[in-house]
Amino acid sequence: METLHHPLVKMEDDYALSSDSEPNSSCMASTWDWKNNDERYSLSQTPSPQSLSPAVSYESPYSSSSHTQGLEEMPFSYSLLQYPSLCHGDNGDLTKKDHGHKPSMTVQRRRKASEREKLRMRAIAEALHTLRNNLPPMYSQGRQPLTKIQTLKCTINYISELTNLLQCSKRV
């Protein structure tokens, strides 16, 4: 990664937008000339000490010798950069890196949490059932039972009506 960072920083410096420093200049005036600058930003021209293989081999049992002669005359040798050693195991195979995952809940803790949630939901359902049973029939919608929210809203309305009745009876 270090070797990749330096050419990118250099490219960033060479091709910085000229409009940032000079407001009257065109955005990427003549500094963007990729056809003439390709030798500065080509892939590695010499084999790096970090490469896995010195050059890409195009030889196969079916290739002719004239074909390989043309490849030897190529001015560049494209090399593969070595993977960081953190991604490889002892035998060179790719391994999954540990990113500090949270330890998962044990089966026993999950069961206990599930039981607590069931009991909580059961208690809420029983309380709503009690509210529905104690509401006057005028608040029920006939055959269908009230939903949780409808039950709570009807209960609030019923309590406010009872409160108003009590306040009116105290005045008289």
UniProtKB/Swiss-Prot annotation:
SMART domains hit by this protein: HLH
Superkingdom of the source species: Eukaryota
Biased composition (Low complexity): 42-66
Name of the featured protein: Mesogenin-1
Region (Disordered): 1-69
SUPFAM superfamilies, sorted: HLH, helix-loop-helix DNA-binding domain
Gene name tied to this protein: msgn1
Function: Involved in specifying the paraxial, but not dorsal, mesoderm. May regulate the expression of T-box transcription factors required for mesoderm formation and differentiation, such as brachyury T, wnt8, vegt and eomes.
Organism of origin: Xenopus tropicalis
Keyword vocabulary terms for this entry: Developmental protein, Differentiation, DNA-binding, Nucleus, Transcription, Transcription regulation
GO-annotated cellular components: nucleus
One GO biological process term: cell differentiation
InterPro entries xrefs: bHLH_dom, HLH_DNA-bd_sf, Mesogenin/MesP
Locations listed in the record: Nucleus
GO terms for MF: DNA binding; DNA-binding transcription factor activity; protein dimerization activity
Biased composition (Polar residues): 18-29
Boundaries of every bHLH domain copy: 108-162
